[in-house]
């Protein structure tokens, strides 16, 4: 379904894979990219992959959207998880690409029901594991 403001469509597979991550925990993360006029799934991370694996898949010079299922233990020793939405927009990416991703982000995020934390990052330090942990608690 295209968005009148950005003209961007969201491929059904994006929503289906997100539901599998959320409900079945089939994936640790999903990386999405804009391909022409639609958002598509680029990479599915297996449950065994960790945060470093995830960040290594993000291209250094191109924007991406991603969701990451972060498991953590609270101060009370309770196991929890939170689903992060990450808008990756490196400083080195093209201005036009950054504009397209920025204008489509909210519309795309609304398609993924169950996002608990949103994070925007322009370089790896803005989405370090320490930042993810602090935002989860």
From Swiss-Prot:
This is Actin-depolymerizing factor 12. Coiled coil: none annotated. It comes from the Eukaryota. Belongs to the actin-binding proteins ADF family. It is found in: Cytoplasm, Cytoskeleton. The modification Phosphoserine is found at residue 6. The keyword Signal does not apply.
């Amino acid at each position: 379904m295209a968005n009148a403001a950005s003209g961007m469509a969201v491929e059904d597979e994006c929503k289906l894979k997100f539901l599998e991550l959320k409900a079945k925990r089939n994936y640790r993360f999903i990386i999405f990219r804009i391909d022409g006029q639609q958002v598509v799934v680029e990479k599915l991370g297996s449950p065994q992959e960790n945060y470093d694996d995830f960040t290594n898949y993000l291209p250094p010079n191109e924007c991406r959207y991603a969701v990451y299922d972060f498991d953590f233990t609270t101060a009370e020793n309770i196991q929890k998880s939170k689903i992060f939405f990450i808008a990756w927009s490196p400083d080195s990416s093209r201005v036009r690409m950054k504009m397209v991703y920025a204008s489509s982000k909210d519309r795309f995020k609304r398609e993924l029901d169950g996002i608990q934390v949103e994070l925007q990052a322009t370089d790896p330090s803005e989405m370090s594991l320490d930042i993810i942990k602090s935002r989860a608690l």
